[in-house]
Amino acid sequence: DTANDPKYGSQYAPQKVNADVDQGVXXXHPEL
């Protein structure tokens, strides 16, 4: 999941992280 990947995590707004969660990409997002 990109939210936990140092290459991507901080680039994405919370809305992107939430979209990933909705798609079932992964879990455990410290940014939420």
Swiss-Prot record:
Signal peptide: none annotated. Keywords: Hydrolase, Protease, Secreted, Serine protease. Its EC number is 3.4.21.-. One of its GO terms (cellular component) is extracellular region. GO terms for biological process: proteolysis. Residues 1-32 are annotated as: Disordered. One of its GO terms (molecular function) is serine-type peptidase activity. The active site is at residue 22. The keyword DNA damage does not apply. It is found in: Secreted. Belongs to the peptidase S8 family. This is Secreted proteinase. It comes from Haloferax mediterranei.
